[in-house]
UniProtKB/Swiss-Prot annotation:
GO terms for molecular function: urocanate hydratase activity. This is Urocanate hydratase. The keyword rRNA processing does not apply. Catalyzes the conversion of urocanate to 4-imidazolone-5-propionate. The active site is at 411. The gene is hutU. The lineage of its organism: Bacteria, Pseudomonadati, Pseudomonadota, Gammaproteobacteria, Pseudomonadales. SUPFAM superfamilies: Urocanase. It is found in: Cytoplasm. NAD(+) binds at residues 53-54, 131, 177-179, 197, 202, 243-244, 264-268, 274-275, 323, 493. Binds 1 NAD(+) per subunit.
Length: 557
């Protein structure tokens, strides 16, 4: 298939309500979530099928999108659709407890797992970059990463500033689908933030959705606002239109001292996601078509300057960390030998949560009714009554987070609680308390579903950072357990050659059969995270495995 069909001037919006357009909720759910990924309120560039993260797409091209929709509409409850890099390639007879969709995106044999080969395949229409939740149809907008970013900032505040970020400020860059969560997360954590972004349209989107509070006119104005708000103890987020590779070195030169430094530009994809210093966005996109190798080189050279400035801040004793976009690797390849001197956010702040299977549990209301999410929020509080931190998160989320597309919620919980909540949501659908079924999924950034040596599995205790058996086992187990759709991807977050990861989504349709699947999947899925970390020798994970009764032959047996 030649690929000349990546642009369509159309607006997609998932159906709402409890009327089916497919044959059952098990096929209606992936249909609605695919469409929701391309809702203009959700996706970064929906007319080109781009959901987030550089070129993370929901379908390979519009012809493939149309055929996926058509196939899901006719799919029976004992059939499974296979999707290969955004292209529907087969429907096979399985059984009612099997997944309705199995997805494999961007996977390459390791020797060829690099951007150069992938871009050749992409240009020929033979591959699609699925990112993490773009090609697996469970992206919920920037909310999907807000709580993880919030938890990171809060933990950094505990470690470095005695538990309070009042009067402190975070310096970062990138206001895309992932980075757009940073300003709101910093505000919720009590800090001011200066958020650099090279595309004005991205800033406008974050202002419109209340993820960022204000835009400064220039660097001097931004610093004046930061000084004012930190002195007043206010947590206000400020956007600045500019290039981080130019602004961070200038801040170092001026002797400006942020209280925390990180970055969420799309550095994982130098051809499509990182604007070289001194270039306009239009130049960048035009030259990416005509001289891609030169564009990649220029972008990586700018990343090297950017990372050197981050290292300069770190040398001053300022907490500095990578937020999972592989910018350190890119800088190292351009000669910054000590690029990895500052840590990634997972080993620095998040791994103890992963050891207990705690990660980005999320759900979406297929009804389209915000009230359904508010009812589930209340149910979470009812079932987890003693977690004040979680209750505060839910309260802040309701107050500050604008729903994008179908109403959804993110809530970090772990082994034991995920199944408990899933079964409760299923019962709420059965009783009619919720007006339509809900889907439960997660980011691929989770405790047992990803191998990414420069991000989630950086600096593992036993040195197993690059072992990618774990996400494969996770995907296989979720398939065996009866998740509604399961995905296995390569290259999400950090780019080609640097990660493998899996995802799952399960439907709560109020039936007894769904309850059985939910109990299995929402126990097994976080259980693999506890297993993976216990196997690596983390005491927290070993203790959790024993407490939860996991059968790990080499550990609990």
């Amino acid at each position: 298939m030649t690929d000349n069909n990546k642009y369509r001037d159309v607006e997609i919006r998932a159906p709402r309500g409890n009327k089916l357009t497919a044959k059952s909720w098990l096929t209606e759910a992936p249909l609605r979530m695919l469409m929701n990924n391309l809702d203009p309120q959700v996706a970064e560039n929906p007319k080109e099928l781009v959901v987030y993260g550089g070129i993370g797409r929901a379908a390979r091209n519009w012809e493939c999108y149309d055929k996926i929709v058509e196939t899901l509409t006719r799919l029976e409850d004992d059939e499974t659709l296979l999707v290969q890099s955004g292209k529907p390639v087969g429907v096979f007879k399985t059984h009612s407890n099997a997944p309705r969709v199995l997805i494999a995106n961007s996977n390459l044999v390791p020797h060829w797992a690099n951007w150069e080969h992938f871009n050749e395949l992409d240009a020929k229409g033979l591959a699609m970059y699925g990112q993490m939740t773009a090609g697996s149809w469970i992206y919920i907008g920037s909310q999907g990463i807000v709580q993880g970013t919030y938890e990171t900032f809060v933990e950094a505040g505990r470690q470095h500033y005695g538990g309070s970020l009042k009067g402190k400020w975070v310096l970062t860059a990138g206001l895309g689908g992932m980075g757009g969560a940073q300003p709101l997360a910093a505000t919720l954590a009590g800090a001011c933030s200066l958020n650099i972004e090279c595309q004005q349209s991205r800033i406008d989107f974050r202002l419109e959705t209340r993820y960022v509070d204000e835009q400064a006119t220039d660097l001097d104005d931004a610093l004046a606002r930061i000084a004012k708000y930190t002195a007043e103890g206010k947590a206000i987020s400020i956007a600045l239109h500019g290039n981080a590779a130019e602004i961070l070195p200038e801040l170092v030169k001026r002797g400006v001292r942020p209280d925390m430094v990180t970055d969420q530009t799309s550095a994982h994809d130098p051809l499509n996601g990182y604007l070289p210093a001194g270039w306009t966005w239009e130049q960048y996109r035009d030259r990416a078509q005509t001289e891609p190798a030169a564009v990649v080189k220029a972008a990586k050279q700018s990343m090297a300057v950017h990372v050197q400035a981050m290292l300069d801040f770190q040398k001053q004793g300022i907490p500095t960390f990578d937020y999972g976009n592989n910018i350190r690797q890119m800088a190292k390849e351009e000669g910054v030998a000590n690029a990895f001197d500052f840590p990634g956010f997972v080993p620095a702040y998040i791994r103890p949560l992963f050891c207990r299977g705690i990660g980005p549990f999320r759900w979406a209301a297929l009804s389209g009714e915000a009230e359904d999410i508010y009812k589930t929020d209340a149910k979470v509080k009812e079932l987890i009554p003693d977690d004040a931190h979680l209750h505060r998160w839910l309260d802040m989320a309701r107050e500050r987070i604008s729903f994008q597309g179908l109403p959804a919620r993110i809530c970090w919980v772990g082994l034991g609680l995920r199944a408990k909540l899933g079964l409760a949501f299923n019962e709420m659908v059965r009783s009619g308390e919720l007006s339509a079924p809900v889907v439960i999924g997660r980011d691929h950034l989770d405790s047992g579903s990803v191998s990414s040596p420069n991000r989630e599995t950086e600096a593992m205790r036993d040195g197993s950072d690059a072992v990618s058996d774990w996400p494969l086992l996770n995907a296989l187990l979720n398939t065996a357990g009866g998740a509604t759709w399961v995905s296995l991807h390569h290259g999400g977050g950090v780019g080609m050659g640097f990660s493998q990861h899996s995802g799952m989504v399960i439907v709560c349709d109020g039936t007894d059969e769904a309850a059985e699947r939910i109990a299995r999947v929402l126990t097994n899925d976080p259980g693999t995270g506890v297993m993976r970390h216990a196997d690596a020798g983390y005491d927290i994970a070993i203790d959790c495995a024993k407490e939860q009764g996991l059968d790990l032959p080499m550990i609990t047996g």
